[in-house]
């Protein structure tokens, strides 16, 4: 007799098969569709980060509760991603499962990953313009803009090894959150499954290359283009943020974090779970 108290959860092997089918489906989409989905994902990621910045803007950074609440708020971006079915670079690296199955070539995988990254960047750029012209930078006596500057500045002083490691741990959490969401039978199930892993990576200061594509370039724009009244309200100056340059962002943060994100998602989650659960399948 069937146990009526048993949970109706997907078996691990079945989750791996679901992830592999999703990977193949994403790769099979047209380039235009992939780019538009990626643009939406970039917007959603920027929305989540904006929520996070709005919460921490006037709160002491030493308070653990601030990091916890900020992390919970940031989860909104990933909830939108999951609900709307968009393509984020850090989760799209899991499509390497389709390559290991022989469905696609490395060239196809790389083109798809680059297309998604470009789409994410385009979406972030569009939303960043909206934020800039909305005047949010000057809100709360410029505290919101100051929060952006300090958040971005803090990301620019990691060593290469630290950035890669933080990137690995970040996308490990992101892809595990996605993997856990495959267990859900309802929308509520999927959302609840994602909350803690995403909150962990944000509260712990792990590095996400697409999220950084929003906050660091935005901080660079503030440093170079913010009007004098902003600096007066902030009681600071652009000279206090010397690390916020495009070249330093690319070399010290973007590239090593992106490498870490790829390792965390494609290797530690996607390939490992495929090797564990799907290797014996024909």
Regions found by a protein language model. Give the residues of each.
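Alpha-helical transmembrane segments and their helix-helix packing motifs
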Residues: 1-282
């Amino acid at each position: 007799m069937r146990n009526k108290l048993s949970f109706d959860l997907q078996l691990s092997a079945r989750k791996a098969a679901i992830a592999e089918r999703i990977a193949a489906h994403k790769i099979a989409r047209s380039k235009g569709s992939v780019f538009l989905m990626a643009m939406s994902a970039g917007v959603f990621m920027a929305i989540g980060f904006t929520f996070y910045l709005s919460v921490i803007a006037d709160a002491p950074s030493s308070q653990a509760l601030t990091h916890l609440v900020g992390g919970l708020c940031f989860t909104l971006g990933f909830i939108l991603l999951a609900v709307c079915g968009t393509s984020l670079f850090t989760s799209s690296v899991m499509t390497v499962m389709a390559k290991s199955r022989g469905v696609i070539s490395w060239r196809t995988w790389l083109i798809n990953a680059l297309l998604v990254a470009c789409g994410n960047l385009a979406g972030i750029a569009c939303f960043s313009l909206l934020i800039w012209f909305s005047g949010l930078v000057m809100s709360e006596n410029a505290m919101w803009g100051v929060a952006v500057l300090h958040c971005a500045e803090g990301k620019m002083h990691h060593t290469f090894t630290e950035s890669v490691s933080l990137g690995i741990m970040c996308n490990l959490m992101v892809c595990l959150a996605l993997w856990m969401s495959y267990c859900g039978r309802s929308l509520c199930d999927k959302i609840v499954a994602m909350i803690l892993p995403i909150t962990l990576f944000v509260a712990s200061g792990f590095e996400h290359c697409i999220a950084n594509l929003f906050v660091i370039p935005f901080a660079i724009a503030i440093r170079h283009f913010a009007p004098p009244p902003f600096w007066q309200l902030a009681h600071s100056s652009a000279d206090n943020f010397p690390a916020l340059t495009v070249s330093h962002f690319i070399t010290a943060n973007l590239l090593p974090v992106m490498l870490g994100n790829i390792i965390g998602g494609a290797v530690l989650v996607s390939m490992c779970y495929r090797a564990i659960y799907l290797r014996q399948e024909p």
